[in-house]
């Protein structure tokens, strides 16, 4: 058999992703409870988490579900689940790569109309926990370490209120305990408002401009068990319409910052001042608007160094006719709008994107893009014949900072049309190739295995914090080979309402060894030389 050649950034090599959902035993169906009254939550959910809840080395899967909605529903109602068909679902991965539904045993069915999920070990006991966002009140599930979870929301003080969407864990004050950012969409209830034409079949979901913005929630982890809501004390008082949140230290000052994708208003970039407070710098950093100075419908987001200059960049998805926004880090606290120079403008103009993550699908050392797509309005084709409610997911190959659409050649899944929403990435089978899960509104979830043929090498790290938080979230990992230097922030956040594998993954191209540097949240810098490729390497934080 002839050996496969190693890909180079200039090669337009497609991926190969295979839908293994049914073969893996995943039978989840999202129930959005669509009604003729077009209540907005019906079209917005929901998310997914890829995480290893039992520490067996294999990723498990958590899928968020809706709840019944009556037509009409009285204003002020908070929908609740009333049967197993509306349960959120936890799937445990067996030794053979198939999944078993363990929701009932684990006790993580959810309570209300679910939106998103964020996974991380908030109490540093070695087991990842789950925070589930909902319309109304959210839920914190503590992982007991025996295959079960306990609802500790009330004790922890993190129920929140309103309509929560994406959430992310981050140790913003670097005290060794993970804090929690929770986005809220807007001030909305079940008032019966007619939007769209009065013609039969033309009623539409209402535009967010009709509703008031609302502040996000920031919970400080006090002692590993209790949280305190500190958004006002932290200087986070500007109201938004938040849908996506991503974490990175974009200015290399040692403190994690975060970006909020807002819907149809300016975007927010919160700079961590290093004293427990944040400053919103979206406009001055040139990330608050698009390249033409306009707002857009920000939905999904990811913070990642796509051009391998070791500085985190930003991608934000939005609605059709707006173009996905790519911001290249200028190394001085500002960003350049790179949508045109990267090739994204022409590729994404007619598409609507939600969940998005940078991933190196072919392990050539350059971060590619995977995007879940679909319009928010199921009536969009009635007014705009060139736009579609159901869309195919999109795979874009990064060729040295320029993106090429390789979707059509990358598997049958990229020809299917879905109402895509959430997206999480992770190495499901630990073969060194990044896989993905995409959720759809009122439809199935799809497990996509990466079968891309490539001789390129790879390296994945599993960080174990000691002075830092146990998951190492917020650590900046730099991997250097003879040809490339790459950097990733350790995070489970980003995308839309979803949570990805915490283990940072690096494609190495032809290189068989790499040097690794980890800047832990504690301030400790740890270096490993000549690390052999093709492995998942566990790295425990040094004590000093």
Residue locations for each model-derived region?
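Beta-propeller blade signature
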Residues: 86-93, 214-222, 271, 328, ...
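Repeat-based blade/solenoid architectures
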Residues: 26-47, 84, 106-118, 157-168, ...
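Blade-edge beta-strand/turn elements of extracellular beta-propeller
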Residues: 17-20, 98-108, 146-158, 225-236, ...
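Hydrophobic beta-strand segments that make up the repeating blades of beta-propeller
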Residues: 58-65, 125-134, 180-184, 257-262, ...
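Asp-box/WD-like beta-propeller blade repeats and closely related beta-sheet repeat scaffolds
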Residues: 102-122, 127, 132-172, 182-209, ...
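Gly/Ser/Thr/Pro-enriched helix-cap/hinge segments flanking short amphipathic alpha-helices
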Residues: 34, 343-346, 378, 386-544
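Beta-propeller blade termini
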Residues: 45-55, 92, 113-127, 142, ...
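Short, conserved, GDST-rich strand-edge loop motifs in beta-rich repeat architectures
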Residues: 64-83, 184-211, 371-389
């Amino acid at each position: 058999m002839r050996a496969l050649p190693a890909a180079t950034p200039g090669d337009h090599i497609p991926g190969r992703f295979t839908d293994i959902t049914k073969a893996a035993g995943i039978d989840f169906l999202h129930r959005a409870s669509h009604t003729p009254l077009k209540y907005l939550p019906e079209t917005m959910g929901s998310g997914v988490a890829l995480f290893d809840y039992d520490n067996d080395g294999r990723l498990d899967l958590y899928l968020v579900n809706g709840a019944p909605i009556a037509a009409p529903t009285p204003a002020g109602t908070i929908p609740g689940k009333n049967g197993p068909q509306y349960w959120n679902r936890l799937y445990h991965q067996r030794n053979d790569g198939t999944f078993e539904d363990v929701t009932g045993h684990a006790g993580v069915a959810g309570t209300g109309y679910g939106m998103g999920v964020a996974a991380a070990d908030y109490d540093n006991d070695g087991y990842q926990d789950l925070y589930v966002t909902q319309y109304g009140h959210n839920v914190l599930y503590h992982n007991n370490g025996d295959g079960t979870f306990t609802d500790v929301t009330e004790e922890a003080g993190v129920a929140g209120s309103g309509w929560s969407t994406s959430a992310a864990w981050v140790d913003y004050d670097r005290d060794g305990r993970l804090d929690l950012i929770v986005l809220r969409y807007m001030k909305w209830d079940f008032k019966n408002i007619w939007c769209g034409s009065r013609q039969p079949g033309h009623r539409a979901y209402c535009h967010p401009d009709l509703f008031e913005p609302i502040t996000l929630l920031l919970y400080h982890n006090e002692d590993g068990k209790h949280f305190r809501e500190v958004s006002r004390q932290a200087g986070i008082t500007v109201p938004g319409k938040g849908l996506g949140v991503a974490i990175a230290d974009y200015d290399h000052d040692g403190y994690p910052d975060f970006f909020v994708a807002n819907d149809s208003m300016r975007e927010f970039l919160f700079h961590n001042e290093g004293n427990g407070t944040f400053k919103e710098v979206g406009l001055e950093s040139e990330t608050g608007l698009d390249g033409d100075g306009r707002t857009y419908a920000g939905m999904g987001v990811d913070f990642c160094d796509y051009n391998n200059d070791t500085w985190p960049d930003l991608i934000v998805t939005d609605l059709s006719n707006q173009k996905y926004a790519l911001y290249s880090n200028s190394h001085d606290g500002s960003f350049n709008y790179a949508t045109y120079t990267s090739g994204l403008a022409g590729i994404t103009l007619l598409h609507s994107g939600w969940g998005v993550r940078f991933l190196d699908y072919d392990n050539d050392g350059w971060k590619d893009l995977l995007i879940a797509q679909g319009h928010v309005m199921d009536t969009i084709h009635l007014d705009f014949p060139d736009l579609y409610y159901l869309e195919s997911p999109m795979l874009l190959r990064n060729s040295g900072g320029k993106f090429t659409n390789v979707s059509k050649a990358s598997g049958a899944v990229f020809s299917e049309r879905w109402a895509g929403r959430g997206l999480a990435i992770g190495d499901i089978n630990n073969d060194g190739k990044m896989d993905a899960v995409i959720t759809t509104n009122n439809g199935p979830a799809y497990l996509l295995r990466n079968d891309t043929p490539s001789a390129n090498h790879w390296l994945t790290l599993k960080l174990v914090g000691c002075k830092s938080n146990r998951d190492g979230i917020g650590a900046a990992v730099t991997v250097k080979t003879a040809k490339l230097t790459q950097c990733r922030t350790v995070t489970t956040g980003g995308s839309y309402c979803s949570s990805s594998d915490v283990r940072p993954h690096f494609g190495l191209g032809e290189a068989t060894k790499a040097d690794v540097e980890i800047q832990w949240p504690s301030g400790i810098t740890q270096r490993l030389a000549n690390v052999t490729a093709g492995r998942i390497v566990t790295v425990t934080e040094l004590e000093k």
